[in-house]
């Protein structure tokens, strides 16, 4: 019989996908899931997690989610995870008295970063994928239904890069990378031609930004984000240095 103290916990977290060997626990001891499970198991919290979304190798996340059943306080668990795992940050949680299937979300938001300002042609090509379509030709074949709905596509434009935001309840394997790859290489109607995954965009610019649930509000966990700030500052300086290199070459 389960303890009365046993609670159901959703944890929202992010990770730098380039630092891990894929996501799924079966792929490697250094996969995202494996690293989390190893720490939770070491501290006798749990030996299993249920993930809301699986990302491709080298794809990062800012708001993925996993579920565990536990008797420990959420703050203690997030403190353990943040203190023992590099290149991940565990920032929010939701506690419930009953089971929550983490995959039953209402919306996922992905961001794809393009390192330049895109023109209207590329925007139009990407916008063609809005709505409900059969994405068989824009995904890696697996057992899942290839019909998916993209509810919204937004473009965030900055001085020297563009962020494409995709909103949808669920996506199939390689779908968004295939969309970006096709849109960059072809002006044809993507659903009127025979095409299969010929142009797969790079995984590193893709980020699972957030997963949203109906009637669930995550509680923010206060943690020391000095590592993230320091990493950002060092990478920002490095990017400026290489920008100077490029300008000196172009002169």
Swiss-Prot record:
GO molecular function: RNA binding; tRNA pseudouridine(38-40) synthase activity
Domain of life: Archaea
E.C. number: 5.4.99.12
Catalytic activity, as annotated: uridine(38/39/40) in tRNA = pseudouridine(38/39/40) in tRNA
Top-tier EC class: isomerase
Pfam families linked: PseudoU_synth_1 (PF01416)
An annotated GO BP: tRNA pseudouridine synthesis
InterPro entries: PsdUridine_synth_cat_dom_sf, PsdUridine_synth_TruA, PsdUridine_synth_TruA_a/b_dom, PsdUridine_synth_TruA_C
Binding site for substrate: 110
Gene3D superfamilies in the record: Pseudouridine synthase I, catalytic domain, C-terminal subdomain
Keyword Disulfide bond annotated: no
Residues the record marks as active site: 56 (nucleophile)
Alphabetically ordered keywords of this record: Isomerase, tRNA processing
UniProt family annotation: Belongs to the tRNA pseudouridine synthase TruA family.
Entry function: Formation of pseudouridine at positions 38, 39 and 40 in the anticodon stem and loop of transfer RNAs.
Protein name in the entry: tRNA pseudouridine synthase A
Annotated source species: Picrophilus torridus (strain ATCC 700027 / DSM 9790 / JCM 10055 / NBRC 100828 / KAW 2/3)
Primary gene name: truA
């Amino acid at each position: 019989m389960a303890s009365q103290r046993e609670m159901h916990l959703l944890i929202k977290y992010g990770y730098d996908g380039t630092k891990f060997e894929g996501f799924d626990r079966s792929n490697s001891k250094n996969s995202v899931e494996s690293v989390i499970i190893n720490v939770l198991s070491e501290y006798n919290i749990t030996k299993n997690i249920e993930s809301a979304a699986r990302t491709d190798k080298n794809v990062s996340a800012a708001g993925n989610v996993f579920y565990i059943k536990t008797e420990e306080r959420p703050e203690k668990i997030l403190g353990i995870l943040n203190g023992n795992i590099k290149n991940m940050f565990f920032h929010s949680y939701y506690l419930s008295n009953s089971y929550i299937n983490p995959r039953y979300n209402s919306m996922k938001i992905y961001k794809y970063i393009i390192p330049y300002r895109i023109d209207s042609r590329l925007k139009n090509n990407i916008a063609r994928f809005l709505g409900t379509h059969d994405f068989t030709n824009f995904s890696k074949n697996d057992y899942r239904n290839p019909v998916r709905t993209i509810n919204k596509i937004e473009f965030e434009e900055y001085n020297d890069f563009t962020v494409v935001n995709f909103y949808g309840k669920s996506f199939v394997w390689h779908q968004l990378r295939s969309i970006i790859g096709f849109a960059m290489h072809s002006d044809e109607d993507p659903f009127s031609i025979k095409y299969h995954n010929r142009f797969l965009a790079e995984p590193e610019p893709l980020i699972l930004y957030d997963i949203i649930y109906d009637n669930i509000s995550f509680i923010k966990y206060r943690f020391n984000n000095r590592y993230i700030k320091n990493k950002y500052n060092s990478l920002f300086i490095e990017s400026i240095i290489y920008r100077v290199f490029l300008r000196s070459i172009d002169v």
